[in-house]
């Protein structure tokens, strides 16, 4: 489950929804680190108040915190609830890193690789001795973790998937058309084989944009409004084209460059949206989650497209582990 609240009351709303979700059988809660509410601070609140749920970050951009800051934060969160925290890392985007933070979005693959390598050194309690292409650290040391914290990596394209297969404990997918999932899973399998790791060595998680509703058009339009801008980003746009929607990706890129958001939304046809999002009746959404699980998705990170509390609870209740077991 992925709650996303912003503004006054965001922490209490997230906590209330998370405690309710834990009470109906959810095993994980995942927090996006995109601003407005600091995900790592919020994770501490949730770890302290929940009893058994994993609390994960999906994901934090590697440019906005140094490895030493990540290491200290991870140690703190791991101490609150040993064995229940998961750190997800990713590159972020040009818009986020350069636009929001004023930082250079340089060599994202190398930056993620070096961050993971240096962070693992620090979490093991070693004195840092690292000179990379982009990062360096000397003399930092903290006590080793008593219980390892898994590191997940966000990945869309083959090179980042390759890195996750080599260096991570899990992989976070996002916004992929269902029809592209076999290619993605084969890419992961082949990357693990090249890395000399077992097929089950990498936990495969994905964000799922969902809404249980009697009016699928409502969910589709929410998806277009919320995620249309994502596909104007070159990374997501090229991923959409790679997944088989070349014409739609080209139209979105052109419309986005012109600032024509109506065209962007229109290019996300019902076919495209239905291939990516999980929107519709309870039975339809449950079936989609079963299809994803059968294809190799182990950890669904459900995000409700609506911010209406009734929509959220209906969606999360219908797709809870208990309900999925009954419906199987």
Question: Would you name each region that the model predicts?
Answer:
Residues 1-328:
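Active-site-adjacent structural elements that line small-molecule/cofactor binding pockets in enzymes
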């Amino acid at each position: 489950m992925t709650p996303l609240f912003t503004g006054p009351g965001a922490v209490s709303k997230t906590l209330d929804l998370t405690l309710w979700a834990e009470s109906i059988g959810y095993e994980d809660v995942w927090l996006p680190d995109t601003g407005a509410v600091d995900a790592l601070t919020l994770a501490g609140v949730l770890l302290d108040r929940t009893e058994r749920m994993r609390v994960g970050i999906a994901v934090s951009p590697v440019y906005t915190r140094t490895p030493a800051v990540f290491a200290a934060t991870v140690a703190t969160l791991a101490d609150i609830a040993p064995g229940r925290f998961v750190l997800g890392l990713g590159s972020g985007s040009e818009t986020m890193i350069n636009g929001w933070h004023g930082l250079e979005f340089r060599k994202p693959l190398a930056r993620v690789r070096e961050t993971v390598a240096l962070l693992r050194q620090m979490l093991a309690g070693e004195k840092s001795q690292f000179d990379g292409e982009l990062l360096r650290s000397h003399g930092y040391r903290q006590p080793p973790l008593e219980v390892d914290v898994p590191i997940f990596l966000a990945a869309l394209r083959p090179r980042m998937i390759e890195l996750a297969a080599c260096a991570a404990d899990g992989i976070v997918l996002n916004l992929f058309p269902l029809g592209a999932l076999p290619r993605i899973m084969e890419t992961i399998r082949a990357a693990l084989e090249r890395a000399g790791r077992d097929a089950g060595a990498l936990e495969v998680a994905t964000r799922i944009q969902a809404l249980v509703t009697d009016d699928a058009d409502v969910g589709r339009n929410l998806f277009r409004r919320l995620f249309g801008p994502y596909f104007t980003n070159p990374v997501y746009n090229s991923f959409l084209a790679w997944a088989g929607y070349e014409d739609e990706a080209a139209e979105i890129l052109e419309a986005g460059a012109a600032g024509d958001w109506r065209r962007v939304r229109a290019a996300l046809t019902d076919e495209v949206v239905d291939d990516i999002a999980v929107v519709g009746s309870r039975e339809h959404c449950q079936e989609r989650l079963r299809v994803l699980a059968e294809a190799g998705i182990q950890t669904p990170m459900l995000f409700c497209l609506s911010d209406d509390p009734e929509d959220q609870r209906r969606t999360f209740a219908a797709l809870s582990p208990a309900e999925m077991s009954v419906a199987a």
